[in-house]
Amino acid sequence: MNAKVILSEMAEHLIENDQENEVKYKANLKKAHKDLDKLTKKVKSELNKDFKSIVFHDAYQYFEKRFGINILGAFTVNTDVMPGAEQLAEIREIIEHDKVSCIFSEPQFNPDIIKAVAKDTNVATGVIDPLGATLNPGKDLYFDLIGNMSKSFKGC
């Protein structure tokens, strides 16, 4: 899990530069790893493995892999380039052929294209925030971000 790798690297760097607090850093790292394991277990147990979705842009591979969800496509790979007619036709085909449950927009982008596709296909829509734009910064931001994304997938 990338979060654990990042935390371990941070702890190592802190210990190298502040050996006086090594015990504290190691204890905090151990607790953070346990908290991440609990979060992973909780989210995995809450998400429906048969739920199929399409997201606005291709930014969820780690979430998808970690929690075993099915993201069948994205409207765009690059948020600077909106999907064209061919891409929209492919998305409609996936929605109809694979019985997609939900398509997701993101708060920082105009949802009109998502709404138009949903109207044509009668698929549910939701909003997912991979940046945590609506969340409060702080020590629990990562946990809140993952929890918020999980709620979005569950709630659609």
Predicted features by range, described:
Residues 1-156:
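Extracytoplasmic metal-acquisition and chelation regions
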